Amino acid sequence: MYLVFFIVILFLIPLFDVFLKNIKNILNGRKTLSCFQTYYDLIKLFKKSNFKSEFTSFVSFLAPLVMLMTSLTFLFLIPVVWEWLNINIIVLFHILGLGSVFLMLYALDNATYFGWLGAAREAFVLAIVEPVTILVILWFVVLAWWNMDLNSISSFLQTHSSIIVSFFVFILAVNLFAILLAENKRFPFDNPSTHLELTMIHEAMLLETTWPKLAILEISSKINLIAFVNLLIFLVWNNTYWIINSFELFGLYILKVLTILTFVAFFETFITKMRLFKYQNVFGFLLILELITISFYLLK
């Protein structure tokens, strides 16, 4: 049954993507897309012919597959549908980092100006996000009495729902949401739908990508977004059920995913694109906020 739920989630990911785009279209007064638009786009990309430059190495072939495997593993290891998994939270983020490294290597291997530009900006953003991510991991470990596995952390947060712990969890949710936007190249840190050289990050790395590889990388990015949403649900919004074991709970999980995606759509609609060199101000503030909250928690 758990495997069935996982496969269903994989098939629903393009629908989640269309849902996010349609909410933004409604808020911007534009025409909505078909529910199956993402499926059509991916099928069209897979039907295109492939082109391999003579200047690229095996990295260009390997990187999209590694990205897909790390995204699937990241989604698979978050135990919303697997009762027996007991994954270390540090290992989880290392798997995510492996995919980011191969994406940058892929951009550099294409030997184009835009690939180098996108890879450099990606490394800059990841270097700024990394300290906040490390503190979020440390914060969860401290809250769970130095337990590093996701199940122990979630169980602790369910059994210790005091006002103080709830406040600290809210701070963690804000930081996790910022990490979600930055890691998935969403507003205000990147615009996934732009091709403007001055602002694009993710699109710059994929600008020279031929169609089948582009389809794999697009699928990987959509899986990553839902995996982060799952992580946010599991760690922060998991106050009633932490394992999906029935169709009712699966429906509750879908409702939570759609709620978070709706919030992402509202946030992206009413906020402007941030300049690259202002990212450090946002994550510097979040870093200081985490340090202050951790200090208060340890001293209380």
Please give the residue ranges for each predicted region.
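Juxtamembrane boundary at the C-terminal end of a transmembrane helix
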Residues: I292-K300
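Juxtamembrane inter-helical linkers in multi-pass membrane proteins
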Residues: N25-F46, D190-P212
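Transmembrane alpha-helical segments that form the membrane-embedded catalytic/substrate-channel core
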Residues: P14-I23, S100-A107, A173-N191, L261-F270
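Alpha-helical transmembrane segments
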Residues: Y2-I13, L85-G97, E130, S161-E183, ...
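Cytosolic juxtamembrane amphipathic/interface segments immediately preceding
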Residues: D41-V59, Y113-L117, L206-P212
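Juxtamembrane/interfacial segments at transmembrane-helix boundaries in multi-pass membrane proteins
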Residues: I137-I171
